[in-house]
Each structure stands twice: as structure tokens, then as C-alpha cells.
């Protein structure tokens, strides 16, 4: 995947990230002493576009000062061996991919949250604030499977919640403060067709309708926001950023899932739609 393609996708996310600061959730006031170390944690969740599937080789290999990741890599999963420490933020081939044969189409390597947070650092370079970026999603999953209340999978608990608990624990060891100003949601492709193995409950198909998807998306947003407020002990709910699913995954004439995402953003104050994906080239849909 060419660098300019990744940079364009990261730019779309970064515009939305900047909007979060204007919205005010990223500047939560703290009463601690001015010399207290401050972290802001940016979490991305969803399916394969959120994780950076088919993005080999890694491009963002030089870390920027003040930007960090949890453990060995940007992904809290994908073989990450240590969720108790911070390391400088950079891209790499996922540990689960190390022994896989690499091809022009293969490899989880360049997660979009890396370039987005790096761009944010370059544009809003406040040296008093440190950024943590984490990818928590899993490729090829429906919103049903990624939901907190799914009975088929524990992806939410093993991904999003694991990262959310890790950051405050790390900050506490450093006597630092940490907030989560926003979460990014990149998903929708696998909800364009029904499958009885991909629903909220065993043997129940996943949702495919616009209203049903929007209901689950709003429920997921509320779950993530409420968990963040509780875990990080912060006053403001994190902003929720989505994109509008597209490319070859869409089905039908009414674009049910894409319209659900757009409507949710238009109707809900704390949701931003970063934009559609159709103007950007891709590799196998990524």
C-alpha cells in the first residue's frame, strides 16, 4: 500500500481528531500540580480496516517524542506480550504475522491510528501532553460480535476493555493522569449480509437493516463512553468517531449500513462521521 494512500486515510481521521479538541472533551481540566505527567489515550475499535489488515510493509517506523503505545505493538491483541508498559509509538508487523508468509496482499502492519495520532502531534504539539494510541479490534467481525453484550464472542472485553484498563494502571504507576478523549469506530463491512454464526446470540443472524444497525451502534457508543468515564474516572464522555463503510462490501441500492452510520452522526451530538472511503484506493478492500 502506498504511503500517500495511508496518509490520506490518516488525514481523514486526524480532521476528526482535531474536532474532538474543539468539542472540548480532550481538554478535561485537572486539579493536579502542573508537573504531573499527563496522558491522553486514543483507542480505535472495529474490524480489519481499524487494525490495518493488508498494509504490509510498515511505514511509520520512526517514533515521535511524546507518543506511546501499550506493550510491544500498537495492537492490544495480535500477540501483544506486555500490556503493563509503554513503548514509543511506531508501526511494525503484528507479532501474530511474524511466521506467516508475506505477500503483496498480506500482513497487518500499518494501523491507521498510528499516523493519525502522529499527525495530531505535529499539528497540536503540546509538550505537556503525551499521547497513547491503541488498536483493539478484530478483522472480519460484525457489530453484533464486537458488541459488549455479545454471547458468541468476548472481543469487547479482550480488546477494548483490556486497553481501557491498561492505560490507567500504567499511569498510576507513574503518578500520572490519563483521560480518553475519543474512540474511533471503523466497521460495517460484515453487516451487509446475514450469517447465523455472527449474531449477538448463538444461532441468531447478525443485523443487516439500517435501523437495527444504528440501534446497535448507538448502544455500543454508549457502552464505550460509559466504560471510559468509569474506568478513567473522567467527567466528560469521549467523542465517538465513525466512518461511512463502502467499497466492494456494500450491497443493495439503499446502502443500509453506510446510511445508518451517517444518520447516527447527523442525529447525535457526540458522533462525528469522518467521511466515506470511496474516494480512496484500497488493497483488497483495505
Show the residue positions of the predicted features.
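Bacterial N-terminal signal peptides that target proteins for export
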Residues: 2-12
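Bacterial N-terminal signal peptides
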Residues: 11-20
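Sec/Tat signal peptide C-region and signal peptidase I cleavage site
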Residues: 22-26
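Cell-envelope and extracellular/periplasmic
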Residues: 29-286
Amino acid at each position: 500500500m502506498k504511503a500517500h494512500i495511508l496518509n490520506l486515510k490518516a488525514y481523514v481521521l486526524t480532521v476528526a481528531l482535531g474536532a474532538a479538541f474543539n468539542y472540548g472533551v480532550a481538554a478535561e481540566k485537572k486539579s493536579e500540580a502542573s508537573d504531573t505527567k499527563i496522558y491522553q489515550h486514543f483507542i480505535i475499535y472495529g474490524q480489519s480496516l481499524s487494525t490495518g489488515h493488508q498494509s504490509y510493509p510498515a511505514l511509520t517506523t520512526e517514533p515521535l517524542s511524546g507518543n506511546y503505545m501499550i506493550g510491544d505493538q500498537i495492537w492490544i491483541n495480535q500477540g501483544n506480550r506486555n500490556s503493563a508498559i509503554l513503548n514509543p509509538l511506531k508501526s511494525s508487523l503484528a507479532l501474530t504475522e511474524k511466521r506467516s508468509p508475506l505477500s503483496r496482499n498480506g500482513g497487518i502492519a500499518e494501523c491507521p491510528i498510528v499516523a493519525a495520532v502522529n499527525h495530531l502531534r505535529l499539528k497540536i504539539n503540546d509538550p505537556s501532553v503525551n499521547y497513547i494510541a491503541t488498536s483493539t479490534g478484530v478483522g472480519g467481525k460484525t457489530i453484533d460480535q464486537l458488541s459488549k453484550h455479545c454471547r458468541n464472542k468476548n472481543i469487547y472485553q479482550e480488546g477494548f476493555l483490556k486497553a481501557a484498563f491498561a492505560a490507567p494502571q500504567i499511569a498510576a504507576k507513574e503518578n500520572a493522569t490519563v483521560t480518553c478523549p475519543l474512540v474511533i469506530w471503523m466497521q460495517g463491512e460484515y453487516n451487509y449480509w446475514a450469517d447465523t454464526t455472527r449474531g449477538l446470540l448463538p444461532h441468531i443472524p447478525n443485523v443487516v437493516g439500517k435501523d437495527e444497525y444504528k440501534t446497535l451502534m448507538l448502544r455500543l457508543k454508549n457502552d464505550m463512553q460509559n466504560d471510559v468515564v468509569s474506568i478513567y474516572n473522567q467527567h466528560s464522555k469521549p467523542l465517538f468517531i465513525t466512518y461511512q463503510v463502502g467499497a466492494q462490501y456494500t450491497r443493495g441500492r439503499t446502502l443500509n449500513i453506510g446510511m445508518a452510520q451517517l444518520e447516527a452522526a447527523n442525529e447525535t451530538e457526540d458522533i462525528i462521521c469522518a467521511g466515506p472511503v470511496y474516494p480512496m484506493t484500497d488493497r483488497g478492500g483495505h
